[in-house]
Amino acid sequence: MRRAWALVALVAAGLAVLTLLAAAAADLLDGHPAARVVLVLANAGSVWAGQAVLAGWLVRRPWAAALAGPLVGLLSLVTYYVLGALTGLTPWSGLADNLGWLVAAALAGVPLGLVGALARRRDGLGALARLVVPAGVVLEPLARGWLGHGELGGGPRGVAGLVLVVAGLAGGALVVRRRIVTSR
């Protein structure tokens, strides 16, 4: 169980550092389109929600998953803003200015962590839980309008949206294929 919690902390730190590096690269490269695409992907809500599902999956048990989901989100946010402030990439007030994200991580993390624990099941409910992240990854760019209004042709959000849709469809296909193969 300790190893699982260490992995949860590693996931949190990893996403925080990735997002911070993406922001730094976008600034350093004067908003280069490729750097902006990576930044949009790193900041995608479905990616941050996905880490809560992964945390729940890592710790396995429902009670632990209900703790791991919010913990990974909160730890990622705090790590992002503290490292950002220490490196001068974000202001020290960043954490206080974004209390809404902390509340969202705490509240949404509980059910998302539980989805992760459910995803370990080998029945239909487990398969359904494993489809939550791919579905969210597909739906986010559609719901946020990233694929409309001419952005698809070259705008960073359009490209990131397309990447998310393709990744989500591929992830969903893997879940469905695995479910079909294991049910034989």
Q: Language-model segments: which ranges?
A:
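N-terminal topogenic module of multi-pass integral membrane proteins
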Residues: 1-70
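Membrane interfacial helix motifs at helix-loop boundaries and amphipathic/re-entrant anchors
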Residues: 20-47, 78-104, 124, 138-163
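Alpha-helical transmembrane segments in multipass membrane proteins, preferentially the mid-helix core
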Residues: 106-126, 140-146, 170-176
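Hydrophobic, membrane-inserted alpha-helices
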Residues: 48-54, 109-113, 166-169
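Structural signal for the C-terminal ends of transmembrane alpha-helices
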Residues: 54-63, 119-120, 173-179
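Internal alpha-helical transmembrane segments of multi-pass membrane proteins
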Residues: 61, 65-70, 117-138
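Hydrophobic core of alpha-helical transmembrane segments in multi-pass integral membrane proteins
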Residues: 13-22, 159-179
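Membrane-interface capping segments at transmembrane-helix boundaries
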Residues: 1-5, 173-184
